[in-house]
Amino acid sequence: MKITQEEVTHVANLSKLRFSEKETAAFATTLSKIVDMVELLGEVDTTGVAPTTTMADRKTVLRPDVAEEGTDRDRLFKNVPKKDNYYIKVPAILDDGGDA
């Protein structure tokens, strides 16, 4: 399946990313190869092969769901450089958020 440069540009715009025309072409080629490889997996005969759900031979160990007292809020905020009424203030990294 061929991924077009327009599709790469569309997804990049949704992700608020900008690429040069050369980078966009390279991504389109690379993504097309990846999709082709994944499509090949669909052609593999898996008759008689048991489904694999995990590669780890571990059982999930869950702790009891017990309410515990948390850490003191003032102690947590002791080293926070900028705060406002128990909210941590951080620099903005997005302009207006856009309409992704």
Curated annotation (Swiss-Prot):
Catalytic activity entry: L-glutamyl-tRNA(Gln) + L-glutamine + ATP + H2O = L-glutaminyl-tRNA(Gln) + L-glutamate + ADP + phosphate + H(+); L-aspartyl-tRNA(Asn) + L-glutamine + ATP + H2O = L-asparaginyl-tRNA(Asn) + L-glutamate + ADP + phosphate + 2 H(+)
Keywords: ATP-binding, Ligase, Nucleotide-binding, Protein biosynthesis
Enzyme class, spelled out: ligase
InterPro entries in the cross-refs: Asp/Glu-ADT_sf_sub_c (IPR036113), GatC (IPR003837)
Pfam families: GatC (PF02686)
Single biological process term from Gene Ontology: regulation of translational fidelity
Keyword Protein biosynthesis listed: yes
EC number: 6.3.5.-
Disulfide bond entries: none
Entries under Gene3D superfamilies matching the protein: Glu-tRNAGln amidotransferase C subunit, N-terminal domain
Domain of life of the native organism: Bacteria
Any one GO MF annotation of this record: ATP binding
Keyword Ribosomal protein in record: no
Function per UniProt: Allows the formation of correctly charged Asn-tRNA(Asn) or Gln-tRNA(Gln) through the transamidation of misacylated Asp-tRNA(Asn) or Glu-tRNA(Gln) in organisms which lack either or both of asparaginyl-tRNA or glutaminyl-tRNA synthetases. The reaction takes place in the presence of glutamine and ATP through an activated phospho-Asp-tRNA(Asn) or phospho-Glu-tRNA(Gln).
Similarity comment text for this entry: Belongs to the GatC family.
Family annotation (PANTHER family): GLUTAMYL-TRNA(GLN) AMIDOTRANSFERASE SUBUNIT C, MITOCHONDRIAL
Assembly information from the UniProt record: Heterotrimer of A, B and C subunits.
Name of this chain's protein: Aspartyl/glutamyl-tRNA(Asn/Gln) amidotransferase subunit C
Species this protein is from: Streptococcus pneumoniae serotype 19F (strain G54)
Organism lineage: Bacteria, Bacillati, Bacillota, Bacilli, Lactobacillales
Name of the gene this protein is made from: gatC
